[in-house]
Regions:
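Covalent nucleotidyltransferase
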Residues: 1-212
Length: 212
């Protein structure tokens, strides 16, 4: 039976289960691009470091997802920064076989993050802002684990043993833009250009028009 991220007990979806399944995520074009850097990455790693000592389950910030109509990609309405960072972390540590894919609608929607990470490892970094921050995150993780230690092994074992989980909020397609705006009120303010972009993309999706 195929894994269904929306039908898990208590709305809990474990990160290992998510990443080892052939799930395709889509980050809609109306969202801000990936913007985490060294500071945010190190904060997440430090938080994980603390919980690893206790060896208890750790609940990440909730992730809001909108299921496709039929077969298709799952839209990430809120939580893409952390989801992307965890993907890069698991990819770097290579502790599981990652089958999930994340696509970014504002970029080339046929290229997923795994392909971008392969380019980064080969020193082929694109000249767009998102890839700059993907690379910054990769470097921060690389620096964090550069010295082999017992702690690093404990970190890898914890991630592999499926103790990280999300609370999944399911968002109806008709409520997507309202939910996105409400959830981002308390976060980093969008620039005027990003607000205009969000409005235009919302109109495009609602009216099925293509913007030049």
């Amino acid at each position: 039976m195929a894994y269904d991220i929306f039908s898990q007990t208590d709305d809990k979806a474990y990160v290992v289960d998510i990443f080892t399944e052939p799930i395709e995520f889509n980050v809609p074009a109306y969202q801000r691009g990936y913007r985490w850097g060294k500071e945010e990455v190190n904060k997440l790693l430090a938080d994980l470091d603390e919980v690893i000592i206790s060896d208890k389950e750790y609940c990440l910030n909730p992730i809001s997802l909108s299921p496709p109509n039929g077969v298709g990609r799952i839209d990430v309405i809120d939580g893409q920064q952390r989801l992307t960072t965890l993907y890069i972390l698991y990819d770097y540590l290579n502790v599981i076989n990652i089958r999930a894919k994340i696509y970014y609608e504002a970029r080339n929607s046929s290229v997923d993050i795994k392909s971008i990470l392969t380019n980064i490892k080969n020193g082929a970094i694109g000249n767009n802002v998102d890839e700059y921050f993907f690379n910054e995150t990769y470097k921060a993780i690389e620096e964090y684990f550069k010295v082999p230690s017992q702690k690093n092994n404990e970190f890898k074992n914890y991630l592999k043993n499926n103790k990280l989980h999300y609370l999944v909020y399911k968002v109806d397609k008709n409520d997507v833009h309202g939910v996105f705006i409400r959830m981002n009120k308390e976060k980093i303010p969008l620039t005027d250009a990003e607000k205009v972009k969000s409005l235009f993309v919302s109109y495009d999706e609602d009216k099925k028009m293509i913007l030049n």
